[in-house]
């Protein structure tokens, strides 16, 4: 085994370990909160067109609220679910609602909204396939 292969193996091992750890930690908190958020959303926005947005991408401290930051501050690159409610009205005005704590409205650029919508549609299609 040459030097290059050894480094590659170590890199892969470390990457897998981190992913395994992150999945365990995130799933424990975020999954439970995500389903709770969905239940609350059903109650709160019965008469509105509400969309649940699920995102699987690296942890972004600048996007999240203080509550989320304290929860995940030990690991800056957590992969997991982050639940956000996007109503049609909030999309129109370029803001969104965070579910875990009542963070109020936060501004979003149009590009960010487009990206979120793309993820939302993709996730929704995946969920629909699972339901069938």
Regions found by a protein language model. Name each.
Residues 2-132:
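Acidic/polar low-complexity segments and flexible, solvent-exposed patches
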């Amino acid at each position: 085994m040459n030097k290059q292969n050894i480094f590659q193996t170590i890199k892969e091992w470390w990457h897998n370990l981190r992913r395994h750890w992150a999945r365990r930690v995130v799933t424990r908190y975020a999954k439970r909160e995500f389903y709770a958020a969905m239940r609350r959303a059903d109650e709160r926005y019965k008469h509105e067109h509400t969309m649940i947005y699920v995102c699987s991408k690296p942890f972004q401290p600048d996007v999240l609220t203080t509550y989320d930051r304290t929860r995940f501050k030990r690991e800056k690159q957590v992969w997991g679910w982050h639940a956000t409610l996007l109503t049609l009205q909030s999309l129109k005005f370029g803001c969104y609602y965070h579910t875990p704590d009542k963070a109020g409205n936060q501004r979003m650029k149009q590009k960010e909204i487009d990206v979120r919508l793309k993820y939302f549609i993709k996730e929704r299609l995946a969920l629909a396939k699972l339901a069938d």
